[in-house]
From Swiss-Prot:
Keyword set, alphabetical order: NADP, Oxidoreductase, Riboflavin biosynthesis
Lineage: Eukaryota, Fungi, Dikarya, Ascomycota, Saccharomycotina
Cysteine disulfide links: none
Organism: Candida glabrata (strain ATCC 2001 / BCRC 20586 / JCM 3761 / NBRC 0622 / NRRL Y-65 / CBS 138)
Protein family per UniProt: Belongs to the HTP reductase family.
The name this protein goes by in its record: 2,5-diamino-6-ribosylamino-4(3H)-pyrimidinone 5'-phosphate reductase
Function: Catalyzes an early step in riboflavin biosynthesis, the NADPH-dependent reduction of the ribose side chain of 2,5-diamino-6-ribosylamino-4(3H)-pyrimidinone 5'-phosphate, yielding 2,5-diamino-6-ribitylamino-4(3H)-pyrimidinone 5'-phosphate.
Gene: RIB7
Top EC class for this record: oxidoreductase
The keyword Ribonucleoprotein belongs to this UniProt entry's keyword annotation: no
Length: 244
């Protein structure tokens, strides 16, 4: 089980889900980037950016969310577990990792990812995580065991509306909070959705990844407000909200 530095919980407190919401879920957009705004050395390459302190912070954040969403590119590149390893606020040995973990949500319109044989399946089978929801635009020919498929209608640009995704997660799965971790296409789209994002939490690692890296750069200007900074051993973390 992981612990977090004592100064992180008070720093993050005002940016966590408040638990008193009607309508769409509380949404936290969070990711780690290099100094040159890259989230990976190359597309499809798993890349270490942040210090162990901020990796532990990620698990702390997961504890406070009902769901955790990533895109198909990230799940294919990283094979993540998407569970929560934080020890919890009460250090309760009877609280299982499965209970503490958010529900994984995979945005996979073309059904490129397979749950079978994944790290997620392994953790779920061990009682250390939850089975995923896969958001897609078509009914799979063969449905994988323990996977729930959320079939969504794409728009004229062959994209799924983020508002529709969040509304459906709340209505059909009672998700009051969702943490979104990437990848770049997901992040760049959501940075333009100030009406849907409640908190933005960005870790900046002490590394440059170079010109071939995968860049976070939304298509237009994005202004932030309510900004706070935290300094760790080798990373800094920025918490903020998007201006309307």
């Amino acid at each position: 089980m992981l612990r977090v530095r004592d100064d992180l919980p008070p720093f993050l407190k005002n940016y966590l889900p408040d638990g008193h919401r009607n309508g769409r879920p509380f949404v936290t957009l969070t990711y780690a980037q290099s100094i040159d705004a890259k989230i990976a050395k190359q597309r499809g390459v798993r890349t270490t950016i942040s210090h162990i302190e901020t990796k532990e912070m990620t698990h702390y954040l997961r504890y406070f969310h009902d769901g955790i969403l990533i895109g198909s590119g990230t799940v294919l590149a990283d094979d993540p577990g998407l569970n929560c390893k934080w020890i919890g606020p009460n250090n309760d040995p009877d609280e299982s990792m499965e209970e503490k973990s958010p529900r994984p949500i995979i945005l996979d319109p073309k059904l490129k990812w397979k749950y079978s044989g994944s790290k997620m399946e392994e953790l779920c089978n061990q009682g250390m995580g939850k089975p995923p929801i896969v958001i897609t635009t078509k009914t799979p020919k063969v449905k994988e065991a323990n996977v729930e498929y959320m079939i969504m209608e794409p728009d004229a640009n062959d994209r799924i509306s983020w508002k529709s995704i969040l509304d459906t997660l709340r209505r059909n799965y009672d998700m009051k909070s969702v943490m979104i971790e990437g990848g770049s296409h997901v992040i760049n789209q959501l940075l333009m959705c100030s009406d849907l994002i409640d908190s933005l939490i960005v870790t900046i690692g002490s590394i440059y990844l170079g010109s071939e890296g995968v860049t976070v750069s939304p298509p237009d200007e994005v202004k932030l407000k309510d900004i706070s900074w935290w300094k760790g051993t080798s990373d800094v973390v920025m918490c903020s909200r998007l201006q309307n």
